[in-house]
Amino acid sequence: MTKSIGCDIIKVTRFNSFLQNRKKLDRFFTQREIENLEMKGKGILESLAGKFSAKEALIKALSPLINTKIKYSLKDIEIIALPKGNIIFQLHNDIKVLIEQMDLKLYLTISHEREYAIAFVIVED
């Protein structure tokens, strides 16, 4: 049963400065996410925006379900592309524990078109 949904849309050009500033990348993205971006070649900005949007969409989806304050950073929410092209969340630290304790399933889709990236998350039990 669907417990919650989250959606986030973001302007792709917001991430131009991330390519010139490694500290910004390191603040929001895991090393694995950054390495995967570097292998991408074309479409790096769209991918960055999509991953960031997915992290924000998950937080929005979880917010109404969480009764206690948890400590997390956006790096605790990792976006992984599987060999067939679909994407999943790889969670770390307190947010991972919370999802496991609540026995929730997460579904994610990301799309981008020129100026914008959007992510949509469904949380089910």
UniProtKB/Swiss-Prot annotation:
Question: In terms of domain of life, where is this protein from?
Answer: Bacteria
Gene name on record? Answer: acpS
Subcellular compartments: Cytoplasm
What family name appears in the similarity comment?
A: Belongs to the P-Pant transferase superfamily. AcpS family.
Q: What does this protein do?
A: Transfers the 4'-phosphopantetheine moiety from coenzyme A to a Ser of acyl-carrier-protein.
Can you say what this protein is called?
Holo-[acyl-carrier-protein] synthase
Q: Name one GO biological process term.
A: fatty acid biosynthetic process
Q: What is its EC number?
A: 2.7.8.7
Catalytic activity, as annotated: apo-[ACP] + CoA = holo-[ACP] + adenosine 3',5'-bisphosphate + H(+)
The protein's enzyme class: transferase
